[in-house]
Regions:
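Transmembrane beta-barrel wall of Gram-negative outer-membrane proteins
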Residues: 1-8, 14-23, 27-47
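Feature captures outer-membrane beta-barrel proteins of Gram-negative bacteria and organelles
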Residues: 165-171, 194-206
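Outer-membrane beta-barrel transmembrane domain signature of Gram-negative proteins
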Residues: 25-39, 45, 57, 69-178
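Short, intrinsically disordered, charge-balanced linker/junction segments flanking boundaries
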Residues: 2-6, 40, 100, 134, ...
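Transmembrane beta-strands of outer-membrane beta-barrel proteins
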Residues: 1, 51-55, 109-113, 179-181, ...
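Solvent-exposed loop/turn segments connecting transmembrane beta-strands
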Residues: 159, 163, 186-196, 218
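Flexible, surface-exposed loop regions and adjacent strand-edge segments
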Residues: 3-17, 67-77, 127-137, 197-200, ...
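Surface-exposed extracellular loop regions of Gram-negative outer-membrane beta-barrel proteins
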Residues: 59-63, 68, 119-128, 189, ...
Length: 257
């Protein structure tokens, strides 16, 4: 678990009620982190090939809380502890690899190929209603101090499948020269397909001196948290009217309009 201090709110600040904190206050952030991982696998030989198969499940849950805080717009009766949101990410990965060593064209080659399937899930849940509420005191800031909570409209529930196949060959030509060639095809359910590859070579002029060069390309798909995270901030303008600002995900209909 983690804990952090935020900046100090002075006694005469609009973000404070003296009835709660006569001398001002410093909100404390609390993070509760929980991890789970289960792995199963098998390896062995299949004819001239070595195989390695695995199934991996991992999950991370994070709860964000505040203590020694308040929602000034709720008045002197505001609570001082809040849960501002829950975040969860889970991933299941199945993997199967084959490897074989053989000699050809005056070199020793190590050839590998395999396939992978990945299932990703991302969820967020709203915080306590008091953590994002806009109370009756319109001249005071809304939401819990040191970070307003996620609202129900900010909640996300996303998942996707990712499948890939790949192959690589490493070749050793004598004692000095070696090459590596690799390629990978990956398909994201929500992002599309991509090809990536790499070519590298190394020449050893002496035991203590060698040159190596490589060329490759890479594509990184955005994570589900980058795609799906949303947040809302609520406040009052100078006339006491309720206003709202939102951080929208890329798939939100408002953002795509």
């Amino acid at each position: 678990d983690t804990e952090g201090a935020n900046y100090f709110r002075y006694p005469d600040s609009s973000a404070n009620w003296r009835e709660i904190y006569p001398n001002g206050y410093r909100p404390i952030s609390e993070g509760e982190n929980r991890d789970l991982q289960i792995v199963a696998g098998a390896r062995g030989q299949w004819g001239d090939w070595d195989y390695d198969a695995s199934l991996d499940y991992g999950r991370n849950d994070f709860t964000y809380r505040l203590r020694n805080s308040l929602n000034a717009s709720l008045g002197p009766g505001s609570t001082t502890r809040f849960k501002t949101g829950d975040f969860a990410f889970a991933q299941t990965v199945g993997n199967f690899d084959l490897t074989r060593v053989f000699d050809a064209a005056g070199a020793t080659h190590t050839f590998g190929t395999g396939a992978e399937f990945r299932r990703e899930q991302y969820r967020t849940h709203a915080g306590d209603p008091a953590s994002y509420a806009a109370g009756p005191f319109t001249d005071r800031p809304t939401g819990s101090q040191a970070g307003g909570g996620l609202t129900p409209q900010d909640e996300a529930d996303l998942s996707r499948n990712v499948a890939s196949v790949y192959a690589n060959v490493s070749s050793q030509f004598g004692d000095k020269f070696s090459t590596d060639l690799a390629g990978r095809y990956e398909h994201y359910q929500d992002f599309g397909s991509q090809w990536t590859g790499k070519l590298a070579a190394r020449y050893a002029f002496a035991p203590a001196f060698a040159l190596r060069g490589a060329v490759s390309n890479n594509v990184r798909a955005p994570s589900l948290s980058q795609i799906g995270y949303e947040a809302t901030s609520t406040g009052y303008d100078a006339a006491g009217r309720l206003t709202q600002g939102r951080l929208l995900s890329v798939n939100n209909p408002i953002a795509r309009a």
